[in-house]
Amino acid sequence: MKKLLLAFPAAVLLAAPASGGETIELTEKQQAKLDKQLEGRSPRKAQSCIDRNDQRKMTVISDDILIFASRRNAKTIYINKPPGGCSGADRYIMSYRRTTGSLCSGEIIQLIDNMSGATMGSCTFGDFVPYTKDLSVGSK
């Protein structure tokens, strides 16, 4: 069963509609995974691009929420909400053209089946919202 986001800080992150006015819904498992990633972090101003070479790992929370972890700065993660979602992001390989050294809002991602090599769909990145760990939180 799915539930509307009510927990903080995830509710702050996702208070705005995803696209077309709908509210993003997460399962309890997805919500717990998101809360764990955001624990002790606070949002900063959204960025249209992030350094492609600085990205250590991408975590798929849901079709609507992707998290990018920085290689150089473990305190910061980037939340991306693809406009219209990215159906299959958790099942398929994401492929994109390396035209610059950045991942940018509006960049098209192809979803590729690992076994057949077939393109299963595509989506685009939205803005990247940095969430940075506040070093004073939990250091009492």
Which residues fall in each region the model found?
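Positively charged n-region of N-terminal signal peptides that target proteins for export
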Residues: M1-L4
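Bacterial N-terminal signal peptides
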Residues: A7-A15
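Residues that line or immediately flank small-molecule/substrate-binding pockets and catalytic motifs
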Residues: F8, S62, T132
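N-terminal secretory signal peptides
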Residues: G20-T76, S136-V137
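Helix-rich interaction surfaces within compact, conserved domain-sized segments
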Residues: N80-K140
